Regions:
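Short alpha-helical DNA-recognition segment
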Residues: 19-37
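Helix-turn-helix DNA-binding elements, focusing on the entry/boundary residues of the two helices
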Residues: 10, 21, 32, 47-50
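Short amphipathic recognition helices of helix-turn-helix/homeodomain-type DNA-binding modules
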Residues: 65-68
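DNA major-groove recognition helix of helix-turn-helix/homeodomain DNA-binding modules
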Residues: 49-63
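A short, Lys/Arg-rich alpha-helix, primarily the initiator
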Residues: 1-16
Length: 68
């Protein structure tokens, strides 16, 4: 399922930057529990929030979706 694959990719990228879920969620103005559910593939995330995550990770949308 794409939500699970995307969530795993987001988590991998966040961890590679040494960020906790809480600190990252706060930095992109997203509720931590909502963000955690995205990483766990339990949310159908909007493109607006996907863009927030990509910007927070300082990567392009193309890079975010690579390997998804």
């Amino acid at each position: 399922m794409i939500t699970v694959r995307l969530g795993k990719r987001i988590k991998q990228l966040r961890l590679s930057k040494g960020l906790s879920q809480e600190k990252f969620a706060i930095s992109i103005d997203m509720d931590r529990t909502y963000y955690a559910s995205v990483e766990n593939g339990k949310r159908n995330i909007s493109i607006v929030n996907i863009e927030k995550i990509a910007k927070g990770l300082d990567i392009s949308l193309e890079e975010l979706f690579r390997e998804v």
